[in-house]
Amino acid sequence: MISTNDFHNGLTIELDGTVYQVVKFQHSKTGRGGAFVRTKLRNIEDGGIIEKTFRAGEKVKKAHVDQKNMQYLYHNGDDYVFMDTDTYEQLSISNEQLGDKVDYLKENMSLEVLMYENRPIDINLPTFVELEVEKTQPGIRGDTVSGGSKPATLETGAVVQVPLFINEGDVIKVDTRSGEYIERVS
């Protein structure tokens, strides 16, 4: 059992025999009433999203989730194929399950795949990834590091805001949690 005060994004819980993953949560306190936790939960069976409010401190059953080290190989249509680095077994995860995380997947990237009852439900990306800028407006003479920003399309198709001095072909470091530019690598 886990307290609703300990909720975090990615946590898997069991409610009424169905397993959900916490997508978003917010602790709230009303003026006279008690505190409560508003959540958005994703059903891992069908991908449906529900909103549920819990009383603060309420106990819910935590679903047991295994983590497997895997390597991302390629994508085929709407499916993304991963390989277990121990058994070389391959499995695919749908674009729907991965959501925005596909923007940071690079071929041959090592990561953790979360499994529930031997079925993949999600992935844990590294905190930072290095991606090449494929398309952006050219920098203009006189641009400075402390200047504005411009959109850049990365090799994975993700679009991030980058400083004006970044050019096509540059490799940049991106925070996978927020999608923000961190630094130029080369």
Swiss-Prot record:
One of its GO terms (biological process) is peptide biosynthetic process. The lineage of its organism: Bacteria, Bacillati, Bacillota, Clostridia, Halanaerobiales. InterPro entries: Elong-fact-P_C, NA-bd_OB-fold, Rib_uL2_dom2, Transl_elong_fac_P/YeiP, Transl_elong_KOW-like, Transl_elong_P/YeiP_cen, Transl_elong_P/YeiP_CS, Transl_elongation_fac_P. GO terms for molecular function: translation elongation factor activity. NCBIfam families: efp, PRK00529.1. One of its GO terms (cellular component) is cytoplasm. It comes from the Bacteria. Pathway: Protein biosynthesis; polypeptide chain elongation. PANTHER family: ELONGATION FACTOR P, ELONGATION FACTOR P (EF-P) FAMILY PROTEIN. This is Elongation factor P. Its main location: cytoplasm. Belongs to the elongation factor P family. The gene is efp. The keyword Protein biosynthesis applies. Involved in peptide bond synthesis. Stimulates efficient translation and peptide-bond synthesis on native or reconstituted 70S ribosomes in vitro. Probably functions indirectly by altering the affinity of the ribosome for aminoacyl-tRNA, thus increasing their reactivity as acceptors for peptidyl transferase. It is found in: Cytoplasm. The keyword Glycosyltransferase does not apply. Keywords: Cytoplasm, Elongation factor, Protein biosynthesis.
